[in-house]
C-alpha cells in the first residue's frame, strides 16, 4: 500500500505575557498559540502530491507579536481573517486523510 506522508509546520504567535487560567481545577499556562499550518503531502518516492496552508484566528494572543510577524511574514490581517482553530484543524485532518503518517518540521 502506498504511503501518505504529511510533512507539516506550525507557526505560533506568542504573548507578551503568559496566559494562565484554571481548567477543571488544573492550572494551565499558555505561552503561545498556533496561527498557521502549512503542509506538504508526499508519496514514498518524495513526489509532492499536494500542499495545504491555513491561517488560524487566535483566541488568546490576538495581537500579532512584532518578532513573529518579522520571522514569518504573517500580518495582523492574516490572523484576523483566519479560521477558528477547531474548524481549521478539521480541514487539515480531512486534507491529510485517514491513512496519513506525519512528520513535523520545527525547532
Over which residues does each language-model region extend?
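Conserved non-catalytic scaffold segment of RNase H-like nuclease domains
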Residues: 2-107
Amino acid at each position: 500500500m502506498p504511503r501518505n506522508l504529511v510533512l507539516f509546520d506550525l507557526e505560533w504567535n506568542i504573548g507578551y505575557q503568559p496566559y494562565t487560567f484554571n481548567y477543571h481545577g488544573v492550572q494551565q499556562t499558555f505561552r503561545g498559540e498556533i496561527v498557521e499550518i502549512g503542509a506538504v503531502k508526499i508519496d514514498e518516492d518524495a513526489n509532492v502530491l499536494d500542499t495545504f496552508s491555513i491561517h488560524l484566528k487566535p483566541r488568546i494572543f490576538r495581537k500579532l507579536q512584532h518578532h513573529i510577524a518579522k520571522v514569518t511574514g504573517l500580518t495582523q490581517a492574516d490572523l484576523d481573517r483566519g479560521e477558528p482553530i477547531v474548524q481549521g484543524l478539521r480541514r487539515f485532518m480531512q486534507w491529510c486523510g485517514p491513512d496519513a503518517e506525519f512528520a513535523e518540521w520545527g525547532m
